[in-house]
C-alpha cells in the first residue's frame, strides 16, 4: 500500500501542476491537517468566539452579563463553538480557504460582572480565567469543544486555542470581595486566591508601569492577578492543563502576553509540549508599536522555541497601506531586515489587524487598501492570520469597538474573494509557503516581490496608488518563459504578463490600485527543505521536516554531521520526513537531508538541540556590585547556560523586583536532574569580568522549578 500511495501522490502532483488545481490534503503530507507542528502552508482565521456566531442560545449567560441587544460591547453577545461549527458546515469558512481557526481561550472564566468607570464588564474575551481545566460555559461544554475539533478536522481545518498562563482575573489587594479575587481552580477545586495567598501562587509586587521588561514580568498586568511561575504547584498545573486541551486534538497554541512572563519558564513549558505526546505549533504575543523594534523580542523568537506574532510586519503594512505614512520602499526594508533578524521567519505569524489594535478598515474609506494588504499578507513569508470580519470590511477603533459582533457572512465581498483565490497557493506552490523574498521592482507606490523555492516561483505586484498607473520596465524574474495569468483573475485590476528567455518580463502597465499574482509550480528533483518543526527539541524527540524532492525511499537526515538512518527515520515521503533527534551536542545546529540516491539538500539553520528534559531554575547572586552601564550575566557548563562562552551568557539579569541591587536574578530553562557548574560575570563597555573563586555547583530538580542563591565571589 505504501509504494502505491507514493505513485498516486506523484501522479497527483504532476496533474495538479499541469492543470493548475489545488491538491486535497491527503496528497501532500506537509500540507495536511495532520501536520500540527508546521503551519507554513496554512492560513489562520482569528475568531473572538463570543463575537462570531451564536449557534446555541441555551448557553448564553443570564442577567447582567449578557447584552441581548448587543449595545454594551463589554458584555457577552452569545457567540459560541456551535456557531463556529455552523460556519464550517455551511461553507463560509471552508469556501474562504482558511485552514486554521484561532479561537478565544476556551477555559472557564469568571462569571462576575465588574464595573469600571460606571460600565459593566465581563470575561467575554476569555482572558479572565478561573479554571484552566474546565470550559467557558458561554462557549459550550467539553462535548461541544470536541465537536468543534472533529468538525474542523473533517473539513481539513486546524484549531488553535488562545492560552493565557500569565494571570487569572482582576483582583484588588485591599478588597478580597472585588470580583472573584483572582481565584485559581483545578477542575473545580480552589487552589488559592490573590488575597491570603499562603501557597505563593501569585506575585504581590503591585502593577507594572511597563518601564522595563523585568517590571512587566514580575508585576501585575493592570489589575490582573499575576501568576508566580517560580512555584511548583503552578508549573505542574499549567503543564497538566495544556495537556488536557492538547489531548482533545488541538493543533496549535497562541500564548498571550509572552513579554510579561519569565522567558526561562516559557522555554521550559514549550519544551515539555514538544517532548510530550501532542507536539503542536506555538506562537506568542509580544506587542510592538508602530516603528518599534525590540532586541528582546528578536532574542525571544530565536531562543525560546516559541514563534511570535509579527507585529513589526503588521505595523509597517498598516503605515504603508492604511495610513499612507510610509512608502513601499520602507515596506521592503522591513521585509528584508526581519528576514535577517529572525531565525525562523517562515514561522512568524503575519497579520494586518487583531483584537488589540484598531481595525484595518477605516470607516468611510475605500476598501482597496484592505484588499491589497490581505493580498500581500497571504503571499508573504510567514503564517498569515486574518482577523474575523476583515473580509467584511468591519471597522472599529480600539477595545471594545474592534471586537464587535460579526456583521455579515457575505461570500461576495472582494476581500473574501481575494482570500479565496490566494489562500490555496500556500498549499499548491511551495514558493509561497517556504520561499525566499526578493525585491524585483520598487518605488514609493509600487512593490514587486518574488517568492522562490527550488524551481517554483511567484511574483506579487502591488500599486497602492489609487489614481496613477505605473509603467513597469526592466522587470526580471525566475519564472520560465511563457504567459502567466493573474491568480486573482483581475479582481484587483491585475493583468497577465509575458516572460521571455532569462526571466525578462515584457514591459506592462500596472493599473492604479492594481494588484496581481503570477506563479509557477514545478516538481523538485533535488531535495529542498522548507521548514523544520518544532525548531527546538532534545534527543529522542521527533521533528518534522517539510519541503519538496525528498523522494519516496528513505535516505539520511543530518543534525550537523550526525547521520540519522534506519529506525531513526519515522517516516519518509516526498514532501515530509519525520526523524528522531539523535544524541548530539546541545546547542544550535543545522538540519539537512540526503536522498537515497545521495543528493544533498540545503541546510535548515539554527535548530536548537536541548541537553534533555527542561526545568526552570531561578539563579540569584547577592553582593554583585557594578558600575553604571555594567550588568551581571550567568554562564555555565551546559548549552542552556552558554557553555562557558561569555557571548552566549544568560542575561542581563534583573535587580529591581524579586530581588534588589546589589542582588541579581534570572529564571532560566536548564536540563532537569543535572549537576551544573556555573559562574556569574560582569559585562559592560566591552569588558568582561569573571567572578573569582571556584565554580558554583547546583543539581537541578528532576521536575518542577528550583532556586539557587549564592554570593558573588571576589
From Swiss-Prot:
Binds 2 calcium ions per subunit. CDD domains: AmyAc_AmyMalt_CGTase_like, IPT_CGTD. One of its GO terms (biological process) is carbohydrate metabolic process. Residues 28-165 are annotated as: A1. InterPro entries: A-amylase_C, Alpha_amylase, Carb-bd-like_fold, CBM20, Glyco_hydro_13_cat_dom, Glyco_hydro_b, Glycoside_hydrolase_SF, Ig-like_fold. Pfam families: Alpha-amylase, CBM_20, TIG. Residues 1-27 form the signal peptide. It comes from the Bacteria. Residues 524-610 are annotated as: D. One of its GO terms (cellular component) is extracellular region. It is found in: Secreted. This is Cyclomaltodextrin glucanotransferase.
Amino acid at each position: 500500500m505504501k509504494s502505491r500511495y507514493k505513485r498516486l501522490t506523484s501522479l497527483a502532483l504532476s496533474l495538479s501542476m499541469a492543470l493548475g488545481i489545488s491538491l486535497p490534503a491527503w496528497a501532500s503530507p506537509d500540507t495536511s491537517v495532520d501536520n500540527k507542528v508546521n503551519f507554513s502552508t496554512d492560513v489562520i482565521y482569528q475568531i473572538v468566539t463570543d463575537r462570531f456566531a451564536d449557534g446555541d442560545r441555551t448557553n448564553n449567560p443570564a442577567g447582567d452579563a449578557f447584552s441581548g441587544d448587543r449595545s454594551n460591547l463589554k458584555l457577552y453577545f452569545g457567540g459560541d463553538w456551535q456557531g463556529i461549527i455552523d460556519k464550517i458546515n455551511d461553507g463560509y469558512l471552508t469556501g474562504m480557504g482558511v485552514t486554521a481557526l484561532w479561537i478565544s481561550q476556551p477555559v472557564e472564566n469568571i462569571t462576575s460582572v465588574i464595573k469600571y468607570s460606571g460600565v459593566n464588564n465581563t470575561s467575554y474575551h476569555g482572558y479572565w480565567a478561573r479554571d484552566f481545566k474546565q470550559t467557558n460555559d458561554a462557549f459550550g461544554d467539553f462535548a461541544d469543544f470536541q465537536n468543534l475539533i472533529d468538525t474542523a478536522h473533517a473539513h481539513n481545518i486546524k484549531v488553535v486555542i488562545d492560552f493565557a498562563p500569565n494571570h487569572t482575573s482582576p483582583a484588588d489587594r485591599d478588597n478580597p470581595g472585588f470580583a472573584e479575587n483572582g481565584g485559581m481552580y483545578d477542575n473545580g477545586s480552589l487552589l488559592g486566591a490573590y488575597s491570603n495567598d499562603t501557597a505563593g501562587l501569585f506575585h504581590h509586587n503591585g502593577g507594572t508601569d511597563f518601564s522595563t521588561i523585568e517590571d512587566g514580568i514580575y508585576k501585575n498586568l493592570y489589575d490582573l492577578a499575576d501568576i508566580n511561575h517560580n512555584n511548583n504547584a503552578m508549573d505542574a498545573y499549567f503543564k497538566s492543563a495544556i495537556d488536557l486541551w492538547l489531548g482533545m486534538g488541538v493543533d496549535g497554541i497562541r500564548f498571550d502576553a509572552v513579554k510579561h512572563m519569565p522567558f526561562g519558564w516559557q522555554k521550559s513549558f514549550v519544551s515539555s509540549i514538544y517532548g510530550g505526546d501532542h507536539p503542536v505549533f506555538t506562537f506568542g504575543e509580544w506587542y510592538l508599536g508602530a516603528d518599534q523594534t525590540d532586541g528582546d523580542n528578536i532574542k525571544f523568537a530565536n531562543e525560546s522555541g516559541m514563534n511570535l506574532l509579527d507585529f513589526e510586519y503588521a505595523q509597517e503594512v498598516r503605515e504603508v497601506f492604511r495610513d499612507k505614512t510610509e512608502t513601499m520602499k520602507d515596506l521592503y526594508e522591513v521585509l528584508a531586515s526581519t528576514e535577517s533578524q529572525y531565525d525562523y521567519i517562515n514561522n512568524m505569524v503575519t497579520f494586518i489587524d487583531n483584537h488589540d489594535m484598531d481595525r484595518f478598515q477605516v470607516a468611510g474609506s475605500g476598501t482597496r487598501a484592505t484588499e491589497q494588504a490581505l493580498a500581500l499578507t497571504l503571499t508573504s513569508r510567514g503564517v498569515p492570520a486574518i482577523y474575523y470580519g476583515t473580509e467584511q470590511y468591519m471597522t472599529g477603533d480600539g477595545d471594545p469597538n474592534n471586537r464587535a459582533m460579526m456583521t455579515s457572512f457575505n461570500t461576495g465581498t472582494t476581500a473574501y474573494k481575494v482570500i479565496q483565490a490566494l489562500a490555496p497557493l500556500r498549499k499548491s506552490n511551495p514558493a509561497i509557503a517556504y520561499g525566499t523574498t526578493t525585491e524585483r521592482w520598487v518605488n514609493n507606490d509600487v512593490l514587486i516581490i518574488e517568492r522562490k523555492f527550488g524551481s517554483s516561483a511567484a511574483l506579487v505586484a502591488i500599486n497602492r496608488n489609487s489614481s496613477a498607473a505605473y509603467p513597469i520596465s526592466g522587470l526580471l524574474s525566475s519564472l520560465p518563459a511563457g504567459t502567466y495569468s493573474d491568480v486573482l483573475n483581475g479582481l484587483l485590476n491585475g493583468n497577465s504578463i509575458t516572460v521571455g528567455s532569462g526571466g525578462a518580463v515584457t514591459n506592462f502597465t500596472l493599473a492604479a490600485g492594481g494588484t496581481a499574482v503570477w506563479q509557477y509550480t514545478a516538481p523538485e528533483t533535488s531535495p529542498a527543505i522548507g521548514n523544520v518543526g518544532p525548531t527546538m527539541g532534545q534527543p529522542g524527540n521527533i521533528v518534522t521536516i517539510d519541503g519538496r524532492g525528498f523522494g519516496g525511499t528513505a535516505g539520511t537526515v543530518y543534525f550537523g554531521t550526525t547521520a540519522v538512518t534506519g529506525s531513526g527515520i519515522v517516516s519518509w515521503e516526498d514532501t515530509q520526513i519525520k526523524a528522531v533527534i539523535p544524541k548530539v551536542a546541545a546547542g544550535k545546529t543545522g538540519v539537512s537531508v540526503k536522498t537515497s540516491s545521495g543528493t544533498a539538500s540545503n541546510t535548515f539553520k539554527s535548530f536548537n538541540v536541548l541537553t534533555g528534559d527542561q526545568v526552570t531554575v531561578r539563579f540569584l547572586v547577592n553582593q554583585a556590585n557594578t558600575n553604571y552601564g555594567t550588568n551581571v550575566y550567568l554562564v555555565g557548563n551546559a548549552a542552556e547556560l552558554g557553555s562557558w562562552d561569555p557571548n552566549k551568557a544568560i542575561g542581563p539579569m534583573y535587580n529591581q523586583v524579586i530581588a534588589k541591587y546589589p542582588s541579581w536574578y534570572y529564571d532560566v530553562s536548564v536540563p532537569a536532574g543535572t549537576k551544573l557548574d556555573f559562574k556569574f560575570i560582569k559585562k559592560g563597555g566591552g569588558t568582561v569580568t569573571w567572578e573569582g573563586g571556584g565554580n558554583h555547583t547546583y543539581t537541578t530538580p528532576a521536575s518542577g522549578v528550583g532556586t539557587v542563591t549564592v554570593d558573588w565571589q571576589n
